[in-house]
Amino acid sequence: MSYERRIYQHIIPNLGPTPLNKLTTGDIQQFYTGLKQNGRLLRQEQYGEGLSDQTVRGIHTTFHAALDKAVSEKIIPKNPSDFCRLPSAKAREMQVLSPEEIQRLLIQAKEDGCFELLLLELSTGLRRGEICALQWDDLNFNTGELQVKRQVHRVKGELAVSEPKTKASNRSVILPPPVLMVLSNYKTEINSAWMFPSPLNNDSPRDPAAVRKRLTAILERAGCKRVRFHDLRHTFATLALENGMDVKTLSTIIGHVSTATTLNVYAHVTDETVSYTHLRAHETELHL
């Protein structure tokens, strides 16, 4: 959830009428409790009425920063959200598609007209907003270099295009020759500056939310487990590490701020890879 949605869909409607100097820790705690119980505005039948722990913590982060600003400008003497109890910071479980599931997914994606987008995602690990923001000018077919320099996201309900969220997100990725060939053939069918234009308007990028819905439908038809689009990014990263890519290179490709972030997210993969390498080395010694 973007910070604009946190502010305009949740914080202002619930706490906006209360003057800052009258806002108490209890008011904010009650607000967070309400979000957990019935704060979801969309897809209630699918996910329930309450927001997830992660989303509530994200709303707190945005609101706490705003109140800190009010303190620094001497509008209020202290931040009333400092002592609020927050839901536990449990990370959403990462899911990775198996090679067999990847094959089934791509076969089904060909039938559903989403093959090129999903193949590129599984070959690069781009974020959903980044892949939707790609233009043909970003890709050099001679060198295979793909520039990632913008993202698509929603601001006040409208699609917007902006620079990536961090300096590290602004990066280049080298595509494998087979992927380049697929994109070259695909380009002849697309009459748009956008690599993946909106089906409704060639002059606009594809809506990341529409891509998410499309993926869900394709996964179901392909008989694969239900995963998020972000899990395709995890799938790329996991397979890259398992096939010998070093963490520093992977960190650059997927746009992490530091290798420490990559190590933290994929520690289980690197640990398993190291253990496997040591085991094979030991087996080799035994056969000498």
Residue ranges of model-derived segments:
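Active-site/catalytic core of tyrosine-dependent DNA strand-transfer enzymes
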Residues: R5, P99-E100, T143, Q151-V155, ...
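Short basic/aromatic active-site micro-motif
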Residues: L23, G58, K225-N243
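Short, Lys/Arg-enriched alpha-helical recognition elements, typified by the DNA-recognition helix
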Residues: M1-V71, P80-F83, R212-A217
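Basic, Lys/Arg- and aromatic-enriched nucleic-acid-binding interface segment
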Residues: L41-Q44, E49-D53, R57-I59, S72-W136, ...
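Catalytic-site neighborhood detector that most strongly recognizes the C-terminal catalytic loop/helix
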Residues: S88, V96, V152, N202, ...
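Short functional hotspots where side chains directly engage DNA or cofactors
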Residues: D82-F83, T143-V148, S198, R228, ...
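C-terminal catalytic core of tyrosine-transesterase DNA break-rejoin enzymes
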Residues: S72, F115, L119, S123-E130, ...
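Conserved small/polar residues in nucleotide/adenosyl-binding loops
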Residues: T277-L286
